[in-house]
């Protein structure tokens, strides 16, 4: 690729790499589903997204696999976006405002293999868990105190 405009591929994960390298100390602020404000830096986010990618690989998620998220925007969802796509899988963000039956249909159609869910939507997943055959597991995004 030498002599071209870019000397490396433009990947979604490279956006977070750039932010960590040039704005590593800049704070990212979000409110958690549990209520408190969460603060950390781009460097922290990059590290956690890379750890998430390794954990997904350990769970058997590979390139091209679909990983669904049923979550509000927050730091955990942010890390998923970069961690999942950074390891070559597809981050499938499911609209949490849909009805349970629609969510089940969408997850089946996409053939999602793993679902990350905010506490807010656990009841929805309990309702449809038996209907989403391709899903091998569910990960509830919360801290230990709220399990």
What residues fall within each predicted segment?
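Secondary-structure boundary/capping motif
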Residues: 17-20, 39-41, 48, 52, ...
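Structural core segment of the AMP-binding/adenylate-forming
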Residues: 15, 58-59, 86-147
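Conserved AMP-binding/adenylate-forming core of the ANL superfamily
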Residues: 28-74, 78-82, 99-104
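A detector for short, charged/polar N-terminal pre-domain segments
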Residues: 1-6
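Conserved phosphate-coordination/catalytic loops
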Residues: 10, 43-47, 97, 116-119
